[in-house]
C-alpha cells in the first residue's frame, strides 16, 4: 500500500510539473507573440558646416560660411503579411559669401509612404504616396535683377498609385507602379510654369513610376545611400523621363562626427530644360534619436 501510494504520488507530482512547465512555456510564447515589436523607428539629425576666410591673401579669395541642417526620420511597421514604410526627408541650407550676402543652398521637404501586402518571398502588392516641396523662395542669381524661381508650396508635387514592391531588406527595395497619378500645385505667380497651364494652379498627369532605395557599407565606417525615382507621363511626351537621383556618402569619425558627401541630380523638363545638379561636402555633427527603437 505504501509503495502504491508513493508510486501514485510520484506520478501526480510528475504530471503537475509537466503541466506547470507546459503552461509556463505557453505563457512565454503568448507573451513573446504579444510583445513582439511591430514598429521600428529611426531618426537622424545632422548639422553640416564648411567655412573659408582670407586676409591679405595674395592670390585673392572670398570669405564664405555655409551650413546645412538635415533631418531623416524612418517609420517601419511589420505585422504578418503587412509592411508599411514611411520616410521623412527634409533639409535647409544657407551660405554667406562676402559681397554677395546670404543665399539658399538647400531647401527640401519630402514625405514618402509605401504600404505593402506580401504575396511571396520579398514581393508585395503595394501602394505608394509621395509629397515634396520646399519651404522658402528660391532665386536665379545669374539674372539681373534676380528672378524668383520657386516659393513655399510652389511647386508642390503629390504622387500616388498601386504597384509591385520588391523588398529584400530595409536597405534594399524597388517599387514599380505602372499607373501612378501625380498632381502639381503652384500659386498664381507661377501659373503657366512647371507643367501647369496658364491661369490654373494645378496639373494632373498619369504615368509610370519607379522608385528604389539601396544602402550598403563600402568599408568599415563608410556607408553609401542611393535614392532614385523615375517618372514617365503617359498623357504628355512619354519619351521624357523625369529623374531624381541622390547619393549620400557618410564617413564616420566617431559616434557624433561624420563627413558628408551628397550628389543630387534632377532631370525634369517642366522645371528646367537643363540637367540640375547639386553637390555638398562638409563635416557634420550627427545626433541619432530613437535609433532602431521598436515598440
PLM regions with names:
Residues 63-69, 105-109, 154-160, 202-208, ...:
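Residues that define the transmembrane beta-barrel architecture of outer-membrane proteins
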Residues 43-45, 86, 127-129, 162, ...:
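Membrane-embedded beta-strand positions of outer-membrane beta-barrel proteins
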Amino acid at each position: 500500500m505504501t509503495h502504491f501510494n508513493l508510486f501514485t504520488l510520484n506520478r501526480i507530482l510528475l504530471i503537475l510539473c509537466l503541466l506547470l512547465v507546459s503552461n509556463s512555456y505557453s505563457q512565454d510564447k503568448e507573451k513573446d507573440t504579444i510583445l513582439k515589436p511591430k514598429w521600428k523607428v529611426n531618426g537622424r539629425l545632422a548639422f553640416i558646416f564648411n567655412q573659408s576666410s582670407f586676409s591679405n591673401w595674395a592670390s585673392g579669395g572670398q570669405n564664405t560660411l555655409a551650413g546645412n541642417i538635415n533631418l531623416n526620420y524612418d517609420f517601419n511597421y511589420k505585422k504578418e503579411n503587412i509592411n508599411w514604410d514611411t520616410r521623412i526627408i527634409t533639409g535647409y541650407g544657407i551660405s554667406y559669401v562676402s559681397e554677395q550676402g546670404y543665399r539658399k543652398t538647400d531647401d527640401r521637404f519630402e514625405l514618402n509612404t509605401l504600404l505593402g501586402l506580401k504575396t511571396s518571398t520579398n514581393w508585395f502588392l503595394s501602394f505608394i504616396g509621395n509629397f515634396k516641396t520646399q519651404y522658402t523662395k528660391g532665386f536665379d542669381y545669374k539674372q539681373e535683377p534676380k528672378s524668383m524661381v520657386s516659393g513655399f508650396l510652389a511647386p508642390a508635387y503629390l504622387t500616388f498609385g498601386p504597384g509591385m514592391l520588391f523588398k529584400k531588406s530595409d536597405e534594399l527595395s524597388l517599387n514599380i507602379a505602372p499607373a501612378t497619378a501625380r498632381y502639381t500645385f503652384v500659386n498664381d505667380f507661377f501659373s503657366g510654369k512647371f507643367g501647369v497651364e496658364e491661369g490654373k494652379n494645378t496639373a494632373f498627369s498619369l504615368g509610370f513610376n519607379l522608385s528604389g532605395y539601396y544602402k550598403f557599407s563600402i568599408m568599415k565606417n563608410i556607408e553609401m545611400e542611393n535614392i532614385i525615382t523615375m517618372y514617365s507621363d503617359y498623357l504628355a511626351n512619354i519619351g521624357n523621363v523625369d529623374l531624381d537621383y541622390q547619393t549620400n556618402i557618410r564617413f564616420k569619425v566617431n559616434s557624433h562626427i561624420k563627413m558628408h558627401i551628397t550628389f543630387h541630380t534632377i532631370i525634369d523638363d517642366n522645371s528646367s530644360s537643363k540637367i540640375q545638379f547639386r553637390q555638398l561636402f562638409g563635416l557634420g555633427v550627427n545626433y541619432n534619436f530613437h535609433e532602431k527603437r521598436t515598440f
